[in-house]
């Protein structure tokens, strides 16, 4: 008997990728063949590879923050991405295609409809992204992580990776804990400007002798800026681009 197969499309940020990985891991346990469509230059490539899912690369990205040249090249880049997606889907013949968000899902979603494959979307954010908003018009089914995110969508919540279910209770995890309090600052995989600006200043108000240890996810683009901000506030922190 042939196993059912799914092609997961997601990229750009952890908010799209991690819920997609949760679905992919669960379906793999259930016996599905799972493949992933994404951009080899995006963070999804590293994350998906680490989970041992076959990765199908398509070259396509967003226009946010790009100049006039990128906008003029959009039709050519979209046509190329659609052709790449078409070749992938003709080869894999997935039973269903799941779009989790990010610009990379747009060309794949168009080709899914063209090849008359079932297209299911999931929007994990409270504000829907451009790709999912556009593809919702042609999707067989649209799901959301939050209520009232998209019209005519079904609110189902966000997929959670299995390792969170397997974690011991906090009372068990921290039973033997010693030393100063530690805090983790996470503003999403791309960082968050408001947190990057205000957290160092807030921590500076706490006396050094009782100040907690800080691990702060800055986002790749804001790493140097955040390091300078902590130095300006005379606060020691473990600053990382992505955790």
Residues covered by each model-derived region:
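Active-site-proximal region of nucleotide-activated glycan assembly enzymes
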Residues: 33, 43, 54, 113-170
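Short internal beta-strands
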Residues: 34-39, 143-145, 212-219
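An amphipathic, basic-hydrophobic alpha-helix
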Residues: 67-96, 114
């Amino acid at each position: 008997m042939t196993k059912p197969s799914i092609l997961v499309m997601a990229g750009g940020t952890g908010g799209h990728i991690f819920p997609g990985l949760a679905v992919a891991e669960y379906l793999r346990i259930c016996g599905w063949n799972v493949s992933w469509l994404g951009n080899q230059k995006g963070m999804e490539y590293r994350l998906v590879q680490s989970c041992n899912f076959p990765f199908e690369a398509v070259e396509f990205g967003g226009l946010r923050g790009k100049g006039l040249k990128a906008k003029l090249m959009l039709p050519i880049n979209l046509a190329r991405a659609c052709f790449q997606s078409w070749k992938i889907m003709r080869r894999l013949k997935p039973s269903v295609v799941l779009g989790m968000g990010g610009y990379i899902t747009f060309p794949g979603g168009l080709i899914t409809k063209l090849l008359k494959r079932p297209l299911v979307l999931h929007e994990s954010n409270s504000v829907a992204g451009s790709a999912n908003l556009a593809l919702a018009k042609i999707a067989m089914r649209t799901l959301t992580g939050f209520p009232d995110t998209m019209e005519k969508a079904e609110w189902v919540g966000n997929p959670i990776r299995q390792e969170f279910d397997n974690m011991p209770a906090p009372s068990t995890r921290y039973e033997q804990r010693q030393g100063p309090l530690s805090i983790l600052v996470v503003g999403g995989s791309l960082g968050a400007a408001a947190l990057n600006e205000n957290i160092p200043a807030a921590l500076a108000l706490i006396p050094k002798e009782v100040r907690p240890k800080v691990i702060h996810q800055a986002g790749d683009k804001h790493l140097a800026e955040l390091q300078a901000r902590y130095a300006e506030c005379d606060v020691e922190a473990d600053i990382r681009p992505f955790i």
